[in-house]
């Protein structure tokens, strides 16, 4: 089994992605972390130029992945533009399963809904979603929520 964890490398999102990597590796599941990075680093500018954003290292094929997990911070009540561009640029996804997660300190807004909508336009199968909310840094106790999220969807992969 092959898993791709694609995430915007900011704060708690990175910690959650790395936690997924640990969990999968302990279960002897192949996992690859993919930080979603665009040439434009300034998030405010990303919102203004989303349609023109270019990924630094686009993925050509996702056929080898049984599951793709996509993570974003919640900024301005939605997913970051770089993640949206990543989803839009994905090749055919009908044979892949997806899980989505978002992190934020307040209301979840439309982050998961936005990512789900972009994936549904590609006929993707989303098996689970989760918003991790905390005003504090994720510690081992908070990361147990990540483990619980994994447990929810592990039988579907």
Q: Model-found features: residue ranges?
A:
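Short, conserved loop/helix-junction motifs that constitute active-site signature segments
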Residues: 89-95
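Charged helix-capping and loop-helix junction motifs
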Residues: 82-88, 112-116, 142-147
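Generic structural signal for helix capping and beta-alpha/helix-loop junctions
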Residues: 40-43, 108, 136
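N-terminal beta1-alpha1-beta2 submodule of the flavodoxin-like/Rossmannoid cofactor-binding fold
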Residues: 1-71, 77-89, 150-157
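Structured loop/turn residues at beta-strand edges in well-structured enzyme cores
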Residues: 63, 93, 124
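Glycine-rich phosphate/pyrophosphate-binding loop and the adjoining helix
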Residues: 56-58, 125-157
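Short, glycine-/small-residue-rich phosphate/pyrophosphate-handling segment
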Residues: 99-134, 141
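Alpha-helix N-cap/loop-to-helix initiation residues
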Residues: 13, 76, 107-108, 139
């Amino acid at each position: 089994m092959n898993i791709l964890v694609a995430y915007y490398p900011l704060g708690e999102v990175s910690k959650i992605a790395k936690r997924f990597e640990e969990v999968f590796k302990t279960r002897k599941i192949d996992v690859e972390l993919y930080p979603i990075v665009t040439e434009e680093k300034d998030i405010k500018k990303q919102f203004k130029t989303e349609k023109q954003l270019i990924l630094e290292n686009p993925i050509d094929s996702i056929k080898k992945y049984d599951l793709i997990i996509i993570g974003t911070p919640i900024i301005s009540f939605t997913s970051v533009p770089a993640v949206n561009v990543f989803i839009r640029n994905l090749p055919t996804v009908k044979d892949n399963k997806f899980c989505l997660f978002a992190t934020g300190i307040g209301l979840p807004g439309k982050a998961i809904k936005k990512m789900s909508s972009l994936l549904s336009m590609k006929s993707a199968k989303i098996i689970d979603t989760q918003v991790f909310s905390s005003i504090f840094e994720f510690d081992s106790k908070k990361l147990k929520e990540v483990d619980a999220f994994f447990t929810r969807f592990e039988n579907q992969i």
